[in-house]
A protein has these predicted regions:
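C-terminal, well-structured catalytic/ligand-binding subdomain of enzymes
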Residues: 1-70, 78, 88, 101-108, ...
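Short cysteine clusters
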Residues: 96
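Active-site pocket-lining segments that scaffold enzyme catalytic pockets across diverse folds
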Residues: 76-77, 81-82, 90-93
């Protein structure tokens, strides 16, 4: 996993990313069908309108590497939405579990990020220090957009993919750009909710938002409807909320493309729920136990699925502590990443 540090204006950050790609001789054999290309181009226009900082960053990347900006941006806008479409079905492969919880006076977040193994070697944990936004850590299997993160104010944003109906995909911001937007622009869960309600969303996804006060939600998103789920409370007074690869509310059932169990979503949800219902203390150790299969199925996928946990994370929102296992957490140790805490203390 690469550990980038990016600082400055969108142009400076994009230029640095582009130069990294040039030094690594990175290639981008982008193949998009007509649906993806048209969707991506229209979504890119909306990114420019609603999130110009990210648009300018991508523009600087493509200028630096000499790649046509419109096509490159269209590809980024397809991520977490419709990157692979086969026989009229969205075939994007993502299976992740994320949850937030309180323990006493502190708030925590944890996740397994489950993807095809080839993405492990290009995944990144990026410290962003933009000159027009909040500092944040962005964990991503891509770049510029990402699956999860935490910012200097103790706000966490994370996405989980839910299979969309092809007929309901609309031009808009995809889940991984929504995560980036929240981290850069919002301090609290209430701000995050208002932000998601105001932005055009491209397809089915779940957006988990939590802040250091213990306020936490999952927003189930679709271009035509958004529904907010609120946390449960266990017998010890600890709150928790979980998201997997499904729209769980009855209110959003009409938008579900699959009634199946996407990469064992039901089992993963049950494992997290059963453990969090019993959580009393030892929050970090408890989160590690859940993520590493000690409480039930979470990440032990069969080899023939060509699918695995490529990283796992635990955040303490109250003090900005970040713990990350760069691989399957049942086999890899969690390391402490102090970059965000250090740069926040300096400012």
């Amino acid at each position: 996993m690469y550990h980038w540090r990016l600082k400055g204006s969108p142009y400076q950050i994009g230029t640095k990313i582009g130069n990294i790609f040039k030094r690594c001789n990175a290639e981008f054999p982008i193949v998009l069908d007509d649906f993806q290309l048209n969707y991506g181009i229209e979504s890119g226009k909306l990114l420019k309108q609603h999130f110009p900082v990210a648009y300018e960053e991508v523009k600087a990347i493509t200028y630096t590497i000499g790649y046509p900006n419109e096509r490159f941006l269209a590809w980024l806008m397809c991520m977490g939405c419709c990157l692979d479409i086969d026989e009229n079905k969205c075939a994007e492969v993502r299976g992740c579990t994320a949850f937030a919880f309180t323990c006493g006076e502190e708030t925590y977040y944890a996740r397994t990020n489950d993807l095809p193994p080839f993405l492990k070697k290009i995944s990144k944990s990026i410290l962003y220090q933009p000159d027009r936004g909040y500092k944040f850590i962005l964990n991503t299997s891509s770049f510029t957009n990402g699956e999860e993160g935490i910012n200097e104010h103790g706000l966490v944003a994370a996405m989980t993919f839910a299979i969309p109906k092809i007929t309901e995909i609309k031009a808009g911001l995809n889940s991984v750009f929504l995560v980036r937007y929240l981290l850069e622009k919002c301090k609290t869960t209430k701000e995050g909710i208002a932000t998601i309600q105001s932005l055009p969303v491209s397809s089915n996804c779940n957006i988990l938002i939590a802040d250091k006060s213990g306020d936490m939600v999952v927003i189930e998103c679709n271009p035509y409807q958004k529904y907010i789920r609120y946390p449960m409370v266990n017998e010890y007074g600890n709150k928790f909320i979980i998201t997997v690869n499904d729209l769980l509310s009855s209110e959003m059932a009409i938008h579900k493309a699959s009634q199946g169990d996407t990469f064992f979503s039901k089992e993963r949800y049950a494992t997290a729920e059963n453990a969090l219902l019993k959580l009393k203390d030892n929050p970090i150790d408890s989160a590690k136990a859940i993520l590493s299969d000690k409480c039930g199925f979470m990440c032990q996928y069969a080899k023939q699925l060509n699918f695995e946990t490529i990283w796992a994370t635990i955040f303490n929102l109250s003090d900005l502590s970040v713990y990350r296992a760069e691989g399957n957490p049942s086999k890899c140790s969690f390391i402490n990443d102090s970059r965000l805490k250090i740069c926040s203390e300096k400012s």
